[in-house]
Design a protein with these regions (language model features):
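Bacterial N-terminal signal peptides that target proteins for export
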Residues: 1-8
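Bacterial N-terminal signal peptides
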Residues: 8-17
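Sec/Tat signal peptide C-region and signal peptidase I cleavage site
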Residues: 19-23
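Core dinuclear metal-dependent hydrolase active-site scaffold
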Residues: 24-62, 66, 94-160, 220-228
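A short helix->loop->beta-strand "cap" motif at the edges of active sites that frequently abuts
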Residues: 48, 84-90, 188-191, 213-214
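Di-metal (Zn2+ and/or Mg2+/Mn2+) metal-binding site signature of metallo-dependent hydrolases
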Residues: 56-95
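Structural motif
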Residues: 68, 142-144, 166, 193
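Cap/insert and terminal regions of metallo-dependent hydrolase folds
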Residues: 150-228
Length: 228
């Protein structure tokens, strides 16, 4: 599996001078809003705003600095919901992040974004999907699996000491709960969070509680947490 480091995003952001959104309730802290289903919003300590797989829930009002999309299914690609974008805002999808078998890493001035393996099941071609490992200032890491089943690369991620990892567990289009638990134990993040639990629902408390791992963190849809 090949990797390429791309500096284009970083250069364009620096030249165009992206604006910032103040982190609500805590400037100087990284904050993450789980919007529901497979959608996340991160506000960095510097006030930069990152959206991952926009589609579900609320909280699309903050101007974006970066939009990440794991694959092409409609419940992950509603980028038009993000109407406000700072100058130089980039949209990075699986198409830019996985080219001829090479998983890209993008170095920005406020984060490093690494594409990793995803898909690997009958509903998601591994050649057309990525997960994202986002490294923020201070070394804080967030891993969003995207729609996936077990991948070979998850064993490598165990060596990265990931801080927060989101695991799909719907068992219909992706891995089921037992497989998600096994993947979470393999990656062994400091905090393992179930998401993308039931198609058509933002969140399911009963299913979230079935995600039985020692380092489980349940984050209901619409809840914002401080990454620490």
């Amino acid at each position: 599996m090949k990797r390429t480091v791309c500096g284009i995003l970083s250069l364009s952001l620096l030249l165009l001078g992206c604006g910032s959104a103040l982190a609500e309730g805590g400037q100087g802290e990284h904050r993450l809003l789980y919007q529901g289903h497979g959608s996340l919003r991160i506000v960095t300590a510097e006030g930069k705003v990152i959206y991952v797989d926009p589609y579900a829930g609320e909280g699309y009002d903050l101007p974006a600095d970066l939009i990440l999309v794991t694959h092409g299914h409609q419940d992950h690609t509603a980028v038009k919901k993000i109407k406000n974008r700072n100058d130089g805002c980039q949209v990075s999808t699986w198409k830019e992040a996985l080219v001829k078998g090479e998983y890209k890493t993008f170095d920005l001035d406020f984060a490093t974004v690494e594409a990793v393996q995803a898909g690997n099941n009958r509903n998601h071609n591994i050649k057309e999907c990525v997960g994202w490992v986002i490294t923020l200032s201070g070394g804080m890491t967030v891993y969003a699996t995207g729609d996936t089943s077990t991948t070979e690369q998850m064993a490598e991620l165990a060596e990265r000491n990931i801080d927060y990892a989101f695991f799909v567990c719907d068992g219909i289009y992706n891995m089921d709960m037992d497989e998600a638990i096994a993947c979470a134990k393999l990656v062994n993040a400091k905090h393992s969070i179930p998401y993308h639990m039931v198609p058509g629902k933002l969140f399911d408390q009963k299913r979230a509680e079935q995600f039985d791992v020692p380092n489980r963190l349940i984050v209901p849809a619409g809840e914002e947490i401080v990454l620490e």
